[in-house]
Amino acid sequence: PYRLAIIAKEGNQKQTQKVLSIVSQDLKRTGEFYIFDNKLLLSLPQTEEDIEYREWRLLNCDFILIADIQETVAGIQLSYEIFDVANKEKIRSSKVYGITDRFRQLGHYASDGVYETITGIPGIASTRIMYVTQTSDSKSKFQLFIADADGLNEQLLLRSSEPIISPVWSPDSSKVAYVSFETGVANVFIQEIATGKRFSVIN
């Protein structure tokens, strides 16, 4: 696996650590990254000039990620840089913007950027999944959910006593379509995610 150190700049460290914990979890979940415990690091560089590449080679560290969060008028901004230890160079400098209460989404987007920079393959942490659950202890036993790729930030779209099958996303991911048997026969519905509004394709 790629051996990566993730470091939060001093200052707004608590909020930065919250987002970086999402980045760390996303990358570990791929099975392709080993994330260092910061307590075991010899130093916590804040800038490129602070990096002593020799000590990082002693730790067998492949890459260093240094990140910082700043509050903006519109929300929060995560700035991060990735350094290649073997080649002693910066390989990425990016900024990701988000809403203050959507720090998880910010972390997912950042982890996708880190993953692609290091592996050359686009990440999937910022994508969403959709699934149907079935329970036997209630009348509304079929439920359609969407969630982040890690299964968190779950959002219920529909409850029904009848089966819900074949859910699919619209091209822009703002709507979903599915087959529901709530009227007694198979019927295709399209539903807006943001508003919950839906309509039947077959009248």
Regions found by a protein language model. Give the residues of each.
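Multi-bladed beta-propeller domains
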Residues: 148-165, 191-203
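Amphipathic beta-strand/beta-sheet edge segments enriched in Tyr/Trp
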Residues: 49-113
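Hydrophobic beta-strand positions that form the internal "hydrophobic ladder"
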Residues: 129, 173-177
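Short beta-strand->alpha-helix linker/helix-N-cap micro-motif
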Residues: 1-54, 65
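Residue-level detector of Asp-centered blade-edge/turn motifs that repeat once per structural unit
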Residues: 121-125, 171-172
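A flexible loop/linker signature enriched in serine peptidases of the S9 family
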Residues: 122, 134-143, 159-162, 179-189, ...
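Hydrophobic beta-strand positions in blades of beta-propellers and related beta-sheet-rich domains
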Residues: 80-82, 144-146, 176, 188-190
